[in-house]
Amino acid sequence: MMNPSKRKLLYSGKVKSMYETDEPGFLIAEFRDDTTAFDGEKHEKLARKGVINNQINAHIMQALKDAGILTHFESVLSPNESLVRRLKMIPLECVVRNIAAGSLCRRLGIESGLRLNPPLYELFLKNDALHDPMINENHALSFGWATQAQLDRMKELSFKINNVLFALFSNVNLILVDAKYEFGVSNDEIYLGDEISPDSCRIWDAKTKEPLDKDRFRKDMGRVVESYEEIAHRFQIKLS
């Protein structure tokens, strides 16, 4: 297993920092305690959140790798750091919705909690300044954000990932309401990048329908870190 040295800071996003390493083609992802909502307009630091998200992300990414899905995740390096493959990211967010919630309800006047059968797939441009506008494949092609082959593959992978994760969450009495996936390219292959955590998914308790995800921060519901810890506990993840 690689144990690379951290080099210079490559990029610092809203909740993660990416560092170059002495291993060509690999980066270190540092999960910080920063918590944001509304494209960064709301921001707080929540103690231990970075550690929890790193561990949950590692657990989920490993489950996807075990299911034959290419991900950028390689290994956990420290409580809040993971080694990841360096990707050329595609500037799109792929969202799969199993249950109506959030912006879908606001856009279409749909009641929250409606089961979507089949699951709904949506594309968004990754751009905080524009508030991640919803787009379609024609936009992506016309502006050169992705090729048709990449769009087809991302959609296929998004549904495969959703199937794996919906079952994974169901097994621990959680509902995967919706999730955001980001993809990148390495050696002409499409890999799942970024993270899968309560920051990037809506996750409800199966019995009570209580949100256990970042909606608790968005809506000032409190107990954000405790809810993330509950998800880790359900997955029997030992937090460092």
From Swiss-Prot:
Enumerate the Gene Ontology biological process terms.
'de novo' IMP biosynthetic process; cobalamin biosynthetic process
Q: Name one GO cellular component term.
A: cytosol
Q: Which gene encodes it?
A: purC
Known pathway: Purine metabolism; IMP biosynthesis via de novo pathway; 5-amino-1-(5-phospho-D-ribosyl)imidazole-4-carboxamide from 5-amino-1-(5-phospho-D-ribosyl)imidazole-4-carboxylate: step 1/2
Q: Does the keyword Transferase apply?
A: no
Report the enzyme's class at the first EC level.
ligase
Catalyzed chemical reaction(s): 5-amino-1-(5-phospho-D-ribosyl)imidazole-4-carboxylate + L-aspartate + ATP = (2S)-2-[5-amino-1-(5-phospho-beta-D-ribosyl)imidazole-4-carboxamido]succinate + ADP + phosphate + 2 H(+)
Q: What is this protein called?
A: Phosphoribosylaminoimidazole-succinocarboxamide synthase
Q: Which UniProt keywords apply?
A: ATP-binding, Ligase, Nucleotide-binding, Purine biosynthesis
Q: Which family does it belong to?
A: Belongs to the SAICAR synthetase family.
Provenance organism: Coxiella burnetii (strain RSA 493 / Nine Mile phase I)
Q: What is one Pfam family matched by this protein?
A: SAICAR_synt
Q: Which domain of life is it from?
A: Bacteria
Asked if the Swiss-Prot or TrEMBL record annotates the protein with the keyword rRNA processing, the reply is: no
